[in-house]
């Protein structure tokens, strides 16, 4: 193949790939549709910049092509030695920077307005959600209500086509309300990123970053962690369910009722059987602990200890309760005291003491946790 034929072939295949790409409606060429005023503004800014850049590109490539053909050496063209003395030659050096500056200021003008709004926290928020990133899940705390959502990625079998994009418990938010997000992390850097509804700031352990939005349209909006945070970085997707304020209130009432019932159940004096605790503990273990200790309890050698036959998980019950309740400083083992209630903690510990051949036969009761907390 000659050189020019080869170049043609490459260009043709590139064109074909681009055309084939546009055939998938969901994977359109542009960004997903923004559904909040501020994200709309950012989207428009992106479109403006892209249009300007495209026009400049066409003009510059046009001039270069024109010059290459028109003034080529093979035609015997000789460079004009006095071009810089002509009026156009003199002024072009001044005009081009002026035009560039004008374009820059056009973009900067809209960008400044968007940035000012990003940092505008003068309005009171209707809903405030603390968003906590951790390896590898998101936790949402509604600051004005006693609601806490732990959001884990759905496994492949349950997520289907939305694998890596679906979670068990989405964040539920009302439309048409000013929503304030407080971003932080419990271990390493993460970033909560849902481009359709809100811009992004880092989640930093020990710091709070603030963003806000006002969602205009009901729907399901997906995002992901946008700050590399370890081997599970790809496995902490985000799903936001935006619903009308009426539906949001109904959801909230239901959520509070369930939480109240769970709290009442957890603080009752009932003595639970081992099987009841084990059954509850299995689900809790798989959502909260298996990310590190693995579903089969074997852990990851050298990083996360296995619990199968572990000294703590099969030995002294108080030591087991202690490490789960208080964590271990300086390691990835977090304190679960504030995250799970007594019944949940009793269940997960009972599960660990009886699963995977850890047949201790122990049934740890909520009352044991209650006294250990003191
Ligand atoms: C982010 C990772 C991570 C998660 C999630 C996690 N652990 Fe751990 N866990 C660790 C690490 C690391 C250690 C080892 C700490 C040390 O160095 O002693 C540990 C130690 C333990 C031990 C002591 C094991 C032994 O033999 O030393 C128990 C018991 C335990 N975890 C229970 C749990 C329970 C119950 C949960 C869920 C509620 C949980 N862990 C969630 C990381 C994790
Ligand atoms: Cu992350």
Walk through the language-model features, giving the residues of each.
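Detector for the c-type heme attachment site
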Residues: 226-230, 293-299, 325, 350-354
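Extracytoplasmic/periplasmic beta-strand context in beta-sandwich domains
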Residues: 190, 236-239, 305, 331, ...
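Hydrophobic single transmembrane helices highlighted by the model
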Residues: 42-62
């Amino acid at each position: 193949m000659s050189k020019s034929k080869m170049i043609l072939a490459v260009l043709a295949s590139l064109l074909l790939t681009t055309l084939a790409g546009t055939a998938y409606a969901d994977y359109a060429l542009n960004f997903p549709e923004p559904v909040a005023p501020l994200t709309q503004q950012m989207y428009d800014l992106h479109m403006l910049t892209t249009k300007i850049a495209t026009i400049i590109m066409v003009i510059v490539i046009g001039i270069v092509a024109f010059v290459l053909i028109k003034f080529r050496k093979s035609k015997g063209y000789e460079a004009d030695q006095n071009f810089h003395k002509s009026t156009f030659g003199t002024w072009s050096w001044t005009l081009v920077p002026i035009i560039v500056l004008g374009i820059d200021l056009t973009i900067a003008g809209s960008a400044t307005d968007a940035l000012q709004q990003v940092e505008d926290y003068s309005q009171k928020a209707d809903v405030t959600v603390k968003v906590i990133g951790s390896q590898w899940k998101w936790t949402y705390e509604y600051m004005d209500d006693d609601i806490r959502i732990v959001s884990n990625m759905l496994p492949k079998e349950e997520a289907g086509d939305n694998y890596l994009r679906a979670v068990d418990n989405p964040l539920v938010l009302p439309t048409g309300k000013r929503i304030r997000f407080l971003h932080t992390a419990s271990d390493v850097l993460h970033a909560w990123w849902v481009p359709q509804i809100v811009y992004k700031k880092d989640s930093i352990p020990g710091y709070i970053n603030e963003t806000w939005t006002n969602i205009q349209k009901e729907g399901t909006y997906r995002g992901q962690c946008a700050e590399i945070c370890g081997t599970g970085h790809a496995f902490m997707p985000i799903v936001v369910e935006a619903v009308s304020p009426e539906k949001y209130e109904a959801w909230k009432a239901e959520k509070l009722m369930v939480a109240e019932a769970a709290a009442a159940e957890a603080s009752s004096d009932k003595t639970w059987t081992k099987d009841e605790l084990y059954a509850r503990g299995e689900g809790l273990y798989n959502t909260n602990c298996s990310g590190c200790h693995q579903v089969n309890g074997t852990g990851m050698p050298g990083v996360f200890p296995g619990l199968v036959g572990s000294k703590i998980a099969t030995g002294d019950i108080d030591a087991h309760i202690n490490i789960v309740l208080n964590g271990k400083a300086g390691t990835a083992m977090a304190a679960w005291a504030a995250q799970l209630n007594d019944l949940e903690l009793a269940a997960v510990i009972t599960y660990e003491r009886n699963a995977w051949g850890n047949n201790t036969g122990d049934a740890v009761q909520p009352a044991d946790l209650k006294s250990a907390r003191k």
